[in-house]
Amino acid sequence: MTHTNMTFSSFGLNSCIITALNDIGYVQPSPIQAACIPYLIKGKDVLGMAQTGSGKTAAFALPLLHNIKLDVRVPQILVLTPTRELAVQVAEAFSNFSKKLIGVHVLALYGGQRYDLQLKSLRKGPQIIVGTPGRLLDHLKRRTLSLSNLHSLVLDEADEMLRMGFIEDVETIMTEIPDRHQTALFSATMPEAIRRISRRFMKNPKEIRIQSNITTRPDIQQSYWMVYGKKTDALIRFLEAEDFSATIIFVRTKNATLEVSEVLERYGYNSAALNGDMNQSLREQTLEKLKDGRLDILIATDVAARGLDVDRISFVINYDIPMDSESYVHRIGRTGRAGRKGKALLFVENRERRLLRNIERAMNISISEVNLPKSDFLSKRRLEKFAQKVQIQLDSKDLHEYRGLLPKLQPNNNSLDIESLAAALLKMAQGERSLIVKPESIVRARHLKIKDTYRNNNYKSLNYVSRYNRDKNVDLYRIDVGRNDGVEVRHIVGAIANEGDISSRKIGNVRLFSNYSTIELPKGLSNTLPKTFIRTKILNKFINIKLLYNSNFKGNYNDIKDVKVYNSNKLRSKKMNNKKFVSSGVRKKIKTNISCNRRRSV
């Protein structure tokens, strides 16, 4: 039996799981699911090669849930993921698949969460743990997590964990697991380091390779925008700049559908939310309004939008980036129908660049970046639309009835020129969307590769003084990874944001040098960051984060004695330890070397 005529019932899965799948809308297994489930349900090891978006989460979650012991309240299933976003996604999938199974508890463990909350959740006895290597290793060392009863281990996106430098931590964790467990390893590629792990820890694994069937959509113009500032403000700008018949905005959660819809309604857009909490009758009414033009914008989750087919949709906005490429293809496929052209826009946070690369790789395309629509352009657009509305009223038959009201609008019976009166009425009529759009107040800190400008002692080229005079709310830190280590800005931003629970929007300029890098972070973190990142590694190298200068420094950095120690490629940190400097009559003690007895990984 091929996967095209199989159902999930064909695998002999627990009836409660089948019921949950039916509720979600899962009918037919994907190729990776059809290939993996029969082996995993029998307790066999599986080595799977499949692209992100192939449905591999269900491929391992469903058979492992089938074999779980509901009456045993200890960790039985462990899933390792490279990022906290993926950990949350996988944990949610387990919860959705097991919602009809009484007594199943799922817990996601990742950096950035408070330990006390995680300990409280661990004491409740979750059977399924999903987490990132660094935080899981911390719990193992603290003896707050026991894997002695584990029977199933999953390494999800193993090649990504290798690229991010987590493989040593993964191997350490695997040595803590009983030999009798089964292992499922999934990876888009199969480098030698991953092969070595499979040979060392897996028992005669069944190797399964699934080719991606994701195709490009030449009829859809695709672009992405790197997020900075408030996403809702940016969303309004993109909607105003685009001529569309109907738009669908994809978000990740039910709450987000309501929040975004509320914002759009406030700005005068005819929009509605579509989520899993809606009953079938209300859902059908909403879709009917979208089809006949009574509704222009729909804010939906992936699950709620299943089966959505409306020819009017000409614009798709991925407000929250999907976690896999298949979901992205399904989303943008809502436009460009019936021979029409369509447009798709993707909002990408700095920490989500990896997901963008996965989408581009799976679709074999390069998605172009766009800028936020400019203020002058938006002002022009708003004025044009407002002028159209004014013209409609000028052509109305009852306009003469309102002419008689004009004299009554003049305050205190004073004479008022008609232009001032019209301007006042215009200001009142503009509503939430001002006809005069203010210039952008948020300047995007672009995370670009910057050449090592310290060569030939050209210190002034970095202009630290002007930078810090501009922004008093950031401190400058140094980390011990640079271009010679193969590091890129995305690696640094991802690690800092992921482990430090720092929004990527709050990360300032990142500068790459030969043997180290500098990064701007919000002011006031210098006492906590060394402990937070004590074991953090990027590309398998400890970052050893150190405070260089804080925003309270008043002097001219170019006047500091021996500043070449910072600026030359031959950084002599030993000489700089606890050294005192004098600048503008103010003595500053700058500690540049932080002793790290323990280390911590993302």
Curated annotation (Swiss-Prot):
Its EC number is 3.6.4.13. It catalyses: ATP + H2O = ADP + phosphate + H(+). Residues 231-378 form the Helicase C-terminal domain. The keyword Cytoplasm applies. Keywords: ATP-binding, Cytoplasm, Helicase, Hydrolase, Nucleotide-binding, RNA-binding, Stress response. SUPFAM superfamilies: P-loop containing nucleoside triphosphate hydrolases (SSF52540). One of its GO terms (cellular component) is cytosol. HAMAP family: DEAD_helicase_DeaD (MF_00964). DEAD-box RNA helicase involved in various cellular processes at low temperature, including ribosome biogenesis, mRNA degradation and translation initiation. This is ATP-dependent RNA helicase DeaD. It comes from Buchnera aphidicola subsp. Baizongia pistaciae (strain Bp).
